[in-house]
Regions:
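Phosphate-binding and adjacent anionic-ligand microenvironments
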Residues: 288-387
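Gly/Ser/Thr-enriched, mixed-charge loops and adjacent short helices
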Residues: 20, 24, 100-245
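Glycine-rich phosphate-binding loop
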Residues: 87-99, 244-268, 314-353
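Short glycine-centered, acidic/aromatic-flanked micro-motifs in structured strand/loop junctions
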Residues: 39-41, 194-196, 264, 347, ...
Length: 387
């Protein structure tokens, strides 16, 4: 049995908890040791998933850092600057509230390679077939105690939980927001409408746009584990598009913040359109030296044609951001993504980041004057059974 899919482990939360999948994954990662950072999204059962994961991690990991609720790209950034060996995000991304999952990052916040993920999947299978009962772990209360020099010098606030094995991390969101704002100019007077999907970016995204000078109207901008992604966010962008005014640009996030879809001139601006717009900015900034942009087998043919006009080639991969990231690293280029709005810009982060993508699109508009129109070719998607 394989537990990992296109983006980590994902299933109904009740099934994951009943079968102790988080605990088993924790045991597997614990054998590898090092510093492991854990974050979760807003779903009601994410805290139970976190506790079970930490039960497994305590069987061997030397340092366990717990951040609480945090967007996926923020966890990747914290793992990068803190040089973590692994990071685990508890989330089901854009899926409904009854689902949950586990995304695993490797060294310094990078997505696992396909070979590393396969090895982890195999170890998880073996662990699941030799179960042992998890022991209770308490991670809700923090207390002061001796910390390492590295932790004392960190910009994060780190304290020890009462079991003295788990470190409670505070300030991760602030540090991430500070980092994101440092990468962009001001957008004074630009009108923005946000659909925050009741998810991890519910308060963080409006704050980022406001502090960069934009005029913001935000919807679904409270964190709510029962409502996350329900009739809102990037999976229901058509409804949102109808509410975006002519003088606004709209951005619809998903539950954990690793993807975004835009609304431009009243029409949905998907990942293919965003890649075209961002390639324009990268070309002007001299960042398309390799003349490659990475898409997937689902990327619309129109994008390849548009890129070709500017002497840029489209490379296609299998569906999944891990395949996009692998191609980016192999080709030595910076920009890639999926039609779903999962965009990767390796000069700005190690994984897809909905907030950074949205701000980058505003930078395109600020620099060029408008976002390029993108009218996709008609495409038919269907599966073929091969016997």
């Amino acid at each position: 049995m394989h537990y990992f899919g296109t983006d980590g482990i994902r299933n109904k939360a009740d099934w994951l908890l009943k079968n102790e999948i988080p605990y088993a994954l924790g045991k597997v990662l614990a054998k590898r040791g090092g510093k492991i950072i854990v974050a979760r999204d807003v779903r009601e059962h994410s805290l139970d998933m976190e506790k079970q994961l930490c039960q497994g991690l305590m069987e061997g990991a030397t340092q366990i850092w717990v951040t609480g609720v945090l967007p996926t790209p923020a966890l990747a950034y914290i793992a990068q600057i803190e040089k973590a060996d692994y990071a685990v995000m508890i989330t089901a991304s854009h899926n409904a509230p009854e689902f949950n999952g586990l995304k695993v990052f490797g060294k310094c916040g990078k997505k696992l390679s396909e070979s590393d993920e396969t090895a982890l999947d195999n170890e998880l299978f073996l662990t699941m077939n030799s179960p042992s009962a998890p022991q209770p772990v308490f991670i809700d209360e923090a207390c002061a105690d001796a910390l390492t020099d590295e932790e004392l010098n960190s910009e994060l606030s780190v304290s020890l939980a009462e079991n003295h094995r788990i470190r409670i991390v505070d300030g991760a969101e602030f540090l991430y927001l500070k980092h994101v704002k440092s990468m962009f100019p001001r957008f004074d007077g630009m009108k923005i409408r946000l659909d925050c999907a009741y998810g991890c970016f519910a308060t963080l995204a409006p704050k980022a746009f406001l502090e960069l000078g934009a005029i913001v109207c935000a919807e679904h901008n409270v964190r709510d584990g029962k409502k996350v992604n329900v009739d809102c966010g990037s999976t229901h962008v058509a409804d949102f598009a109808a509410r975006v005014q002519k003088d606004e640009i709209g951005f619809a996030f998903d539950g954990d913040g690793d993807r975004v879809l835009a609304v431009v001139d009243g029409k949905v601006y998907d990942g293919d359109a965003m890649l075209l717009a961002l390639s324009t900015l990268y070309r002007l900034q001299g960042k398309l030296k390799k003349r490659f942009v990475v898409g997937t087998i689902l990327t619309n043919t129109k994008l390849g044609r548009e890129l070709a006009y500017h002497n840029t080639a489209l490379i296609r991969t299998d569906v999944g951001d891990k395949h996009v990231l692998d191609a980016l690293e192999k080709q030595g280029c910076l920009l890639g993504g999926e039609k779903s709005g999962h965009i990767v810009m390796l000069d700005k982060g190690t994984t897809g980041d909905g907030l950074v993508t949205a701000l980058s699109l505003l930078e395109v508009k600020r620099t060029v004057g408008s976002l390029p129109k993108f009218i996709p070719y008609p495409m038919l998607e269907f599966g073929i059974l091969i016997r």
